[in-house]
Amino acid sequence: FPDKQLAFSPEFLRAASALEDLQNTKLMLLGGTGCKTWREVFHVDIEIAEPRELILAKYARNSFLALKVAFFNQMYDLCDALDVEYSAVAHYTTMDERIGDSHSFITEERGFGGHCFPKDINALVKTAQRNNVELSILKETVEYNRRIRKS
């Protein structure tokens, strides 16, 4: 499409609050040839990058959050085995601003589900495999999640 201006923007909306997330966007990530127009339309900070970088960043963000969910589920399992109160351990752990409490809450369903986390972590693992890169931490995250979601 040499005569067209195309822009790519990965969405980081949460399914449960997509409209609110969209209305309260503080930063847009854009890539492609048609990015300048978006600066005139949206009055938010806009970061312009290569589309491939943005695609990989989207997968990385969601994979990291899936990993965080799995980590806290494993901490829950350890607390249960040691007869230690998980909510206290999670609270004291997430007090560290670098960690934060997002994705640390254990639900009855356990692990991560929904549409984006499973799709994106699997896409990142498969992309790495096709390029002869081993993402063993993420592969184990997928396997662990599969095991706890089955039970």
Where are the regions that the model predicts?
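Ferredoxin-like iron-sulfur electron-transfer modules
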Residues: 143
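Internal alpha-helical scaffold of NAD(P)-dependent oxidoreductase catalytic cores
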Residues: 1-9, 13-101, 127-133, 140
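A short glycine/serine-rich beta->alpha loop
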Residues: 108-112
